[in-house]
């Protein structure tokens, strides 16, 4: 599960992978105390996240092999990077159903689930708007993605 501290907004964002949601908390930077928990966005298996130069959260989704952009002001989300395949999508849907029932899904973590990427997409590195960004997997792959 990933998290991000947004000092400009005094917020802490937390990914809850098994609940398919991103939580937002008010954060008192001086004391570290949290309050006002809300669900910012519902996306499949959110993991690590970063804030881009436009103030949007970019969140890796391992089971969907996608990167989502989430607006912290209103929770609107859309996919900015997609490496999912049809077989991976079917297996992701099975895994999400199992999570909703409180069941495990480890046996679904097969090469088919990961799609075209070399492993489950778990992280990202982003710079300013004119730079490429990078996606990382659970293993050792780091893929450069041009914004052109």
Segments predicted by a language model, with ranges:
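Beta-rich, blade/repeat-based domains predominating
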Residues: 1-11, 39-58, 64, 90-92, ...
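Short coil turn/linker residues within repeat-based beta-strand modules
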Residues: 9, 19, 29-34, 64, ...
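Short loop/turn segments immediately following the C-termini of beta-strands
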Residues: 17, 27, 62-63, 72, ...
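Eukaryotic tandem repeat interaction scaffolds
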Residues: 17-45, 53
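Structural signal for beta-propeller blades
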Residues: 20-22, 65-68, 141-143
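Short loop/turn segments immediately following beta-strands, especially the blade-tip
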Residues: 25-32, 70-78, 145-148
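Beta-propeller fold detector
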Residues: 33-42, 77-93
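C-terminal/domain-terminus segments
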Residues: 132-148
